[in-house]
Each structure stands twice: as structure tokens, then as C-alpha cells.
Amino acid sequence: EVDVADSTKIGVFFGAGTTENKAGSFKVESNDIHVGLYGLTNVEDIASIHYGFIYTHQSADANRTLTVKDLAGYNKWSGDADVTQIFAEAAFKGFNTAAYSVEPYFGLAWIHAESDGYSESVGGMTFTTNPEDQDLQVSSLGIRAGVPFSFGAAKVTLKGDLAWNHFFGDTEAEARMNLAGSGTALIKGGELSDMATVGLGVEAQLSKTATFGLSYTGAYDGDVTMHGLRANLRFAF
């Protein structure tokens, strides 16, 4: 991360992690690599503007039991997926004090996702699924807060975030399945609806160049509930 002007800094980052999803007999695990470029511009003490680009590559292993009438077959496959995201966010800083920060914000993001197809077999029949590429846009209106305090020699900040997110664009994931050579069917996933997100976390400044954070993220709408825990160790140089 470097300062390119009095009020602007830019940086690059790299990350790695794992993702696991389960739904009925379906399970997928992936190893994820993230790289990105970001920037921050402060407008006096009134507002801040974040912007950037993130690319994620996932190498996934999946399995499930496919059932067709009275037949069932256990299948495993591997594949790759790529996700590209461009984002921008503006936050108002006029409520901040030395004792706490409270920042309303509005953000926009564009997300492009593509993944490999896969084949499954049951009772001598083969079914091939090819997911369609997906372009999704997200708008977010929220508020975040932070309270700094000291814990021994470490400077610690307790953070919270609450937002409402609206999805538009390709809000239904689609794939085409070849039905054992007898035709092709269009498969649609559940449509993404407006979603509330909640974040709670704590971040400690371990040294001038190192920070450690632990956080929880939850997402909720009428049909979907998601929970996530994240530990983050960051070194600046």
C-alpha cells in the first residue's frame, strides 16, 4: 500500500482460503486464490471513496448422489471457477469523533462468474451440465461503526456493519443439462432477492506493519441464511 497523493492511497493484495458448501446430498469444497487492486480517496474530513478490482480462482472438488426414478448413482468431479469483481463505495465521515466512528455508505459492485461443466452417471446414463456465465450487479446501502480501545500494549477496534443489498442483472443462475443424449434442459437456480447483511468483528494492531482480525458475517433474506467466520492476518510493507 502506497500514498500516491495527500488524500489518495492505492494497494494490492493476495489471499488464499477454502470454501465448503453443502445442500442435501451435494457437497463441494474448493481451494481459493484471491488477488486484487484497491484505492482509497479521502475528501477532506467529509467523505471517503473506496474502489477496486478483485479476481478469485477456485479449484473445486464436488460429489453428490444423483437419483433418476428408482436408480441412484454416486458421482465425483473436479472443476475450476473464476470470479471477477469491480466495486466502488462512498462513505460519509461527518459523524466520526476521536472516541468512535459512524459512517453511512452506499456501494455498487459488478460481478462476473464462470465455471467448468461436469458429467454425472446413473444406471448407464450420462448427464452433462454446462453452467452459463453470470453477470450480477449489487447495490448496498448501510452503516458501519467502530470503537477503538487499548488491550495491554495493543490498539484494538471493535467493528460493526449493517447493510441492505439489492441484486440485479443475472439474478438466477442458469445451466444447460444434456439428458443422456435425449435432449437438453435449461436449469435455473433460485432467484436472488434483497438481502440484509450483518458484520461484527475485532481488529488488533500488533505492530506498525501487522494487524490481526477476527470477524463474523451473516446474510439473511426470506429463503437464504448464510454465516461466515473469518480470521485475517495482514502485513503492510
Describe each PLM feature range.
Residues G52-F53, E103-F106, T157-D161:
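Beta-strand segments within the central parallel beta-sheet cores of soluble alpha/beta enzyme folds
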Residues D6, D45, I49, Y55-S59, ...:
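Membrane-insertion modules used to breach or fuse lipid bilayers
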Residues A90, G94, V102, G107-S115:
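Solvent-exposed flexible segments
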Residues T19-E29, H57-Q85, I111-S139, F167-L179, ...:
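Extracellular/periplasm-exposed beta-strand and loop segments of Gram-negative cell-envelope proteins
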Residues E1-T97, G213, T217, D221-D223, ...:
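Outer membrane beta-barrel translocator domains of Type V secretion systems
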Residues I10, T41, S121, M125-F237:
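Outer membrane beta-barrel transmembrane domains
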